[in-house]
Amino acid sequence: MRVEHKAYVGLGANLGDREATLRRAVELLAGSPGIEVVAVSTLRETDPVGYADQPRFLNGVAALVTNLSPRALLDRLLEVERELGRVRGEGPRFGPRTVDLDLLLHGEEVVDERGLVVPHPRLAERRFVLEPLHELDPELTLPDGRRVADLLRE
């Protein structure tokens, strides 16, 4: 029997029908073996980061319970992105996208390998991630001991 972990996935989109796309992404994740979506934060309209000349984003976070490894969960996230029309590698790195699914946290695991870093390396810098994480779990603590609530106050 595989161990279940609480995982958090960042949701983002700034092209097309953003809300419908993010709703569909959550549905596809919920229908995936080894993944149970337990909560989804409020979706927030946010300004782009890193590449300003693009439409505003709709961002949120989904809380999952999963028995998938971090790598297997990331693979499923990338698969869902492809199913929803995302083509990685086109345009600027932080440019417009139909959908963006980021593995933010996977239990207490810390992973640093090619193509996968958990916790997400820019998690603590991004209010559009911290605010929905705090909404879903006001007591959430990162694997390094920092509390999301404290990061929001910084």
Residue ranges and their predicted role:
Residues 21, 25, 73-76:
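Hydrophobic side chains in well-ordered alpha-helices
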Residues 1-6, 150-154:
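Short, low-complexity, intrinsically disordered N-terminal peptides in bacterial proteins
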Residues 24, 29-69:
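Short, surface-exposed acidic-centric catalytic microdomains
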Residues 34, 49-57, 68-154:
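Flexible, gly/pro- and Lys/Arg-enriched active-site loops
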Residues 3-23, 34:
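Extended accessory regions or peripheral subdomains of proteins
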